[in-house]
Amino acid sequence: MKLQIVKGRQIQDDKAVLQPVINAEQLLYCKKLVEQIYMADDIYRYLCELCQTTRTNPLIELGVSPRGSVALMRISKAIAFLHGRDYVIPGDIDEIFLDVAAHRLVRSAKAKAAKRSAESILIEVMQNVKKPTAARR
């Protein structure tokens, strides 16, 4: 049965053909707009503290790397853009933190023994890092 399901996916359904909603030029323009989204220093510090806390938490053997922090910053700016703002708020970071960080960390033996999921540990990290109030320019 599984083989038939997988093989059946080879057939192209005319209704499933996707049409582009923007062209490459428009996409590059949006990318430039996202890069210009403002992040206050307090918001940068919040993002960095969240990521740093994953590197010092005893339940995490390997936390979010500096590259992961940069990815979180970029995605947070994109989230702000999608919400129609030209600045990042803590909620933008919170909205995507679990998704960005969960697959980047390695749980410690202690966390595995306690059957703690990456998500539950990250929620605890978020609860223990003070959120800033500054966001706008």
Task: Annotate each predicted stretch with a short phrase.
Residues 1-49:
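Conserved AAA+ ATPase core "coupling" helix
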Residues 5, 32, 45-52, 67-81:
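C-terminal helical "lid" of AAA+/P-loop NTPase domains
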Residues 17, 25-37, 55-60, 105-113:
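Short hinge/gating elements
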Residues 56-137:
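C-terminal engagement/docking regions of AAA+ P-loop ATPases
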